[in-house]
Amino acid sequence: MAGKSSNGDGVKFADDAGSGNSIDGIAIIDPGTVTSASGGSGSDAGSGDSGNTPRKRGRPAGSGTGAKRGRPAGNSAAKKVPGNLGVEKILFSLHLMASSALKVEELALDEKEAEALAGAVQEVASHYDITPDPKIMAWAGLFGVCASIYGPRVAAYKMRAAAEKRDKKEAAKPMAQKVQEAKPTEHDPAAPYIEQLPVSNTL
């Protein structure tokens, strides 16, 4: 049975006790019987018959999980704007307040027009690197809802107050005319006043 010996470098040699091959007392070692100090076999050390290239140290190319070169994945495309931002409510309320302030009823939008305009605005914003602040959008949505609720009420109140004021003016006009017609004529103190005395026919 073949034994193993090692030299000072930690390389083990498999002794071929039965071969008897030696030159001048020095044993001839077959390279195929050399094993590393870690206990691997000689055939695993990479023989010429395997036909495989020696494996290089380090991580294989493309197998790592690290970030790839180039632009980061987060910046490869523009950030999309969330669809539900309440833009249509904001636009609806803004046009409603503008129509009330300018007294132009044609500026007010209905729900379908506000929705179509909001969709167009969001489509344009989706092509830009925009990330809306959720807090700002929440406050804007609250403002839009409040304006859509209270805006029509304020406009209706103003219209009713204006109508009542106009009705009061119309009701006061006939009264003023009646008072003016019933007013007696006054004597002009500058005009000469001649008192007619009774004339006696007797002389």
From Swiss-Prot:
Residue ranges, annotated region (Disordered): 1-80, 166-203
Keyword Nucleus appears in the UniProt entry: no
Lyase listed as a keyword: no
Keywords for this protein: Viral capsid assembly, Viral release from host cell
Annotated Gly residues bias: 39-49
Annotated Basic and acidic residues bias: 180-189
Main function: Assembly protein. The major coat protein P3 and two assembly factors (P10 and P17) are needed during the assembly of the virus particle inside the host cell, when the capsid protein multimers are capable of enclosing the host-derived membrane, containing the virus-encoded membrane-associated proteins.
Protein name: Protein P10
Species: Enterobacteria phage PRD1 (Bacteriophage PRD1)
Gene giving rise to this polypeptide: X
